[in-house]
A protein has these predicted regions:
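Terminal low-complexity "docking" segments
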Residues: 1-103, 107-169
């Protein structure tokens, strides 16, 4: 974020895992699976919240060694739209058509997918322009202000599975 400060139209979001032992210190995040059949799954619920540019949370992000806590994302969309889009990624379709849960908040899984030549990041996450995943700045390129998708809609390319091995299974 230091290399490319937020524009006046942008907000910084944290996308968090409730299952991480790291326990990121973010106040009042929105549960992503609210209003789904998984709304009661508190122990593994992913969350999203707005992070102030001067938040102490960013110091925690810079110093944590944890790789499963979540990630940072920049968007011009509202918190509600960001949550709605990540909710649409609750499940994805494997090459054989089976719907599986997608750990979109976990950089260990998401980063190799976004780095794949077979995945157009701005189509997968159209409401996010850029982010920070496991200490790496990532350009997503999304500019959308709405999502409107319902899971499962994204099909994991076979080549992503082949190149990542068991890392994304």
């Amino acid at each position: 974020m230091a290399r490319e400060p937020l524009k006046s139209s942008e907000q910084l979001f944290a996308v968090l895992s409730n299952a991480s032992d790291a326990r990121p210190p973010l106040v009042a995040p929105s549960p992503i699976w609210a209003d789904t059949i998984y709304a009661e799954w508190d122990a593994v619920m992913p969350f999203a919240g707005i992070v102030a540019a001067d938040s102490e949370f960013l110091d925690w992000v810079a110093s944590t060694e944890s790789r499963d806590w979540g990630r940072l994302a920049v968007s011009s969309a509202s918190l509600e739209v960001v949550v709605e889009h990540f909710r649409s990624l609750t499940q994805v379709l494997m090459p054989g058509g089976t719907a599986v849960f997608f750990r979109f908040w976990d950089g260990r899984f998401l980063l190799p997918i976004l780095q794949s030549d077979e995945v157009q990041s701005a189509q997968l996450i159209p409401v996010i322009s850029r982010g920070l995943i496991n200490g790496q700045a990532v350009d997503i390129g999304g500019r959308a202000q709405v999502s409107g998708r319902v899971f499962p809609w994204w099909k994991v390319p076979e080549s992503v599975l082949a190149s990542a091995g068991n890392a994304v299974r």
